[in-house]
Regions:
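Membrane-embedded alpha-helical hairpins and interfacial helices in multi-pass inner-membrane proteins
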Residues: 82-90, 100-182
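Membrane-helix interface segments
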Residues: 18-21, 61-65, 104-109, 137-138
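Hydrophobic transmembrane alpha-helices
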Residues: 1-54
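Central hydrophobic cores of alpha-helical transmembrane segments
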Residues: 64-75, 109-119
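Interfacial aromatic-anchored transmembrane helix boundaries in multi-pass membrane proteins
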Residues: 33-46, 69-101, 133
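Helical-face signature of the major facilitator-like transporter fold
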Residues: 25, 29, 71-75, 145
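Small-residue-rich segments of transmembrane alpha-helices in multi-pass membrane proteins
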Residues: 29, 56-61, 117-125
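Generic transmembrane alpha-helix motif of multi-pass integral membrane proteins
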Residues: 48-64, 96-102
């Protein structure tokens, strides 16, 4: 039942998104993009994984709005690239995993999830290269990226261990205040 409720297309909910949420999700997507660009000098150490986890846990399926605002901003800023195709699904996969595990309380568990995602990032992106260059290209692309996946893993682990719990609490509180008007 839980999987079914996640998969209901947003346009089938027959609910209009309130203006406050439209604004909030646009700003969160832009913040995600700005932070990723600000940290782009660090190889594969980025705040996107952390923020996707927080958005998924706090907003449920509505987390797709800020995620895809971020993806569209990436495309507009950097142009259409092969990795944009990966971004169309990898962040949603992380959000889905976070949503299923949203009741986890221990920060270490969230850090392990983020680290595993960072470690598997290249593997998750490899299918695009399988279709564009064949099996040999996809495997060589994935293997050559393992050092970057290790950095992604470590960066995600530390960032999520330190920041997930306070960010989750902050976003939950601010979102509740926004929805109640207090």
């Amino acid at each position: 039942m839980a999987f079914t409720s996640w998969c209901i297309p947003l346009d089938k909910l027959n609910k209009k998104l309130p203006l406050g949420e439209i604004t909030l999700f646009g700003v969160l997507g832009a913040i995600t993009f700005a932070l990723q660009v600000a940290m782009s000098g660090l190889p594969n150490i980025e705040p996107v994984s952390l923020l996707v986890l927080v958005y998924a846990v706090v907003f449920g399926r509505k987390c797709l709005y800020p995620i895809y605002v971020f993806v569209v901003m990436e495309i507009l800023f950097f142009g259409i690239q092969m990795w944009n195709i990966n971004y169309l699904y990898v962040w949603a996969l992380l959000a889905l995993a976070a949503w299923f595990l949203r009741d986890m309380k221990h920060p270490l568990a969230w850090a392990v999830l983020a680290a595993a995602f960072g470690l598997l990032f290249g593997l998750l992106c490899a299918p695009v290269y399988l279709f564009t260059g064949g099996l040999g290209y996809a495997v060589s692309w994935w293997i050559s990226g393992i050092p970057f996946d290790l950095m992604h893993c470590g960066g995600n682990f530390v960032m999520v261990l330190l920041l997930f719990a306070p960010l989750r609490k902050l976003v939950e509180n601010l979102y509740a205040r926004m929805r109640t008007g207090k």
